[in-house]
């Protein structure tokens, strides 16, 4: 994405005070729902902003739990994959795929949001696989874009995702393995999702899944 005044205005609209007006999808209640839907995502994103980390969007999410000194050993990698998929569904993910880490899709740098400078991505050693999740948005609300209600559909799933990826990463670290929670911040998720078997690459440069399109 190229940063412009229009892109800045778009993202700022999610952080400014609501400006209700007449019309379906733009009332005070509609903006209240949108802002509440983004709350958990915003809390996670802002918690280390003073350190230059806008986590989940421009930096990987910081670990909240250490890697256990005692490692759970699996007889087969398939057993570990099946377990992670079950745990992902338990935490609330609609789709879960796993693939090997392809470093072609990782960003070479991240941005320090204090001065917009480039800094190291800061991923730990020992990462070998990528867990890719899918979340179903409310179709009826999505179809109301560009209303505040459309933003509520997006915000709800970003907040869900923030919680889910942190929980999965914590689970894996408690098993004795390194894991980093990530959203839109670490690499190109579209090719990762395709490699993880969640769907096919579409002409609109997104992933089309059998379940949700």
Regions picked out by a protein language model, each given a short descriptive name:
Residues 1-99, 103, 107, 113, ...:
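Iron-sulfur (Fe-S) cluster-binding modules
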Residues 85, 91-213:
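Catalytic cores of enzyme domains
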């Amino acid at each position: 994405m190229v940063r412009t005044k229009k892109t800045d205005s778009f993202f700022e609209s999610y952080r400014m005070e609501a400006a209700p007006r007449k019309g379906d999808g733009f009332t005070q209640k509609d903006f209240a729902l949108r802002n509440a839907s983004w709350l958990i995502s915003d809390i996670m994103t802002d918690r280390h902003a003073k350190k230059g980390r806008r986590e989940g969007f421009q930096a990987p999410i910081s670990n909240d739990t250490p890697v256990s000194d005692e490692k759970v050993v699996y007889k087969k990698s398939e057993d570990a994959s099946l377990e992670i998929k079950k745990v992902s569904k338990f935490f609330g993910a609609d789709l879960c795929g796993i693939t090997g880490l392809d470093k072609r899709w990782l960003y070479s740098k991240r941005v320090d949001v204090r001065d917009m400078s480039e800094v190291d991505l800061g991923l730990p050693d020992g990462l070998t696989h990528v867990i890719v999740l899918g979340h179903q948005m409310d179709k009826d609300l999505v179809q109301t874009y560009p209303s505040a209600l459309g933003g509520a559909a997006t915000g709800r799933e970003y907040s869900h995702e923030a919680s889910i990826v942190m929980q999965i990463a914590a689970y894996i670290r408690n098993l004795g393995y390194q894991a980093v929670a990530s959203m839109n911040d670490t690499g190109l998720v579209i090719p990762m999702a395709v490699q993880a078997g969640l769907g096919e690459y579409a002409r609109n440069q997104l992933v089309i899944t059998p379940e949700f399109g």
